[in-house]
Design a protein with these regions (language model features):
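Short alpha-helical DNA-recognition segment
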Residues: 15-33
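A detector for short, charged/polar N-terminal pre-domain segments
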Residues: 1-2
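Solvent-exposed, flexible loop/coil residues
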Residues: 5-7, 33, 45
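DNA major-groove recognition helix of helix-turn-helix/homeodomain DNA-binding modules
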Residues: 44-62
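Short basic helix-loop element that most often maps to the first helix and adjoining turn
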Residues: 5-20, 49, 57
Length: 62
């Protein structure tokens, strides 16, 4: 599963708009949009926040 697919899945599970998801990750709406469309690679800091968010909401990709 790509990061784009994981991002869309987590956002769907949490029922968040791209705007609200961006706020939770500390990035812009445009960044979330590019990440979900596979046009960008997440920074290490974004990946850490994403992992923390998944852990906080008991979302696993195992």
């Amino acid at each position: 599963m790509t990061f784009a697919e994981k991002g869309k899945h987590v956002r769907s599970v949490l029922q968040l708009s791209q705007e609200k998801f961006a706020i939770m990750l500390g990035v812009s709406f445009a960044t979330v949009n590019r990440l979900e469309n596979g046009h960008a690679v997440p920074s290490y800091a974004t990946m850490e926040k994403f992992a923390s968010l998944c852990k906080e909401h008991n979302i696993s990709f195992d």
